[in-house]
Amino acid sequence: MRSPCPCNSGKLYADCCAPFISKDALPATPEQLMRSRYSAFVIQDGDYLIATWHPQAVAEAWRDEITAGFRTTRWRDLAVQECAAGQDSDSGYVTFLALFYDERQRRNGFIHERSRFVRLNERWYYVDGRHIVPGRNAPCPCGSGLKYKKCCEQ
């Protein structure tokens, strides 16, 4: 795939997330893992998503839900807003805004999250995330041009 990487890094997919998703390399940072997970959502690679969730999450149980989401969700954009170290070298956080179109509801949506990552045995895993909710009168992050209270909050 000689196209731009879906993660919006500015690199080609082959030089960015592809080596991680194809298991030819391991992400060296939480940001690389987060970007590659976003790309996996875009290209609908459930195996990679499940493999990069923290083992205690038992993500395999969500396979059907993940696959169903692939059928109805079209990912539109990713903006990494902040990368922060955790309390030690084996933890970190990435704050991002991901935009998507939900074909079931026929509307735009977003995920604004501060994701938590940990490194176990030299490998980074996604643990969980804290959703960031905009103020009611703030512009809706989905890109509609409406206030949040008149758009995605409903």
Curated annotation (Swiss-Prot):
<dbReference type="InterPro" id="IPR048469">
    <property type="entry name" value="YchJ-like_M"/>
</dbReference>
<dbReference type="Pfam" id="PF02810">
    <property type="entry name" value="SEC-C"/>
</dbReference>
<dbReference type="InterPro" id="IPR032710">
    <property type="entry name" value="NTF2-like_dom_sf"/>
</dbReference>
<dbReference type="Pfam" id="PF17775">
    <property type="entry name" value="YchJ_M-like"/>
</dbReference>
<dbReference type="InterPro" id="IPR023006">
    <property type="entry name" value="UPF0225"/>
</dbReference>
<dbReference type="InterPro" id="IPR004027">
    <property type="entry name" value="SEC_C_motif"/>
</dbReference>
<protein>
    <recommendedName>
        <fullName>UPF0225 protein SG1365</fullName>
    </recommendedName>
</protein>
<comment type="similarity">
    <text>Belongs to the UPF0225 family.</text>
</comment>
